[in-house]
Amino acid sequence: RIMNDSGFVRLRRLSTDELVGTEKSAGLIERYFSLMPEGDTALQDIDLSAREMRIGDNRLCLHTLSDAEDMPGKVVTDIRYEKLSTDRSDCRLSFASPVGLLLSCNHIYNQYVIIDNSEENLQKFEKSARNMQSLSRYSRSNSINREWIDQYLNEAHSYGLTSVRAHFNVMAWSDDAEELKHIKNDVGSQLASMECVPRHNTIDCPTLYWAAMPGNAAD
């Protein structure tokens, strides 16, 4: 709904054949379970061990962004790509392009935007702001937090913004253990280039893999 309301792009729901496949072609779910994005797919054993998840010969590594403290102070829709920009012209890419097209390894970038009851959330923030106001005499940080909450509420009411929750993760894989070490570093470096704090997940990798299955991304 958010994407369609922007007027710039349109999203559509995938058909059943596109999800589960047909007799002649593999569907998105089948390709996801085998980590084979194109061509013929083969059945693969899946090891959901907490310390190391494997699908066939491939080992997975996963990085997440789910805490506001891990995000940069300012998030924009697009950034200047220096390598293709000049003094007279800018090459603009998506803010998340470092973990998308610019990440040169086998990977999947998952992005979840959960639309909650916005009015209910704003009421919770109003209550939190009043609590911060009452506690501001005990700590300057409470006063600062109240100002941030007030600023958020003012913008939400002024521009009719919808309150959402979001989660992002990058799932990468390789059949070579040594290469996987370099991939972990590359993913972390790309997240750091976005001024985000990289968080390498190990224990909950199988859970997040299962949650990212096409059609299984509900809250």
Predicted regions and their residues:
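Extended, folded cores of ATP/NTP-driven motor/assembly subunits in large transport
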Residues: 1-219
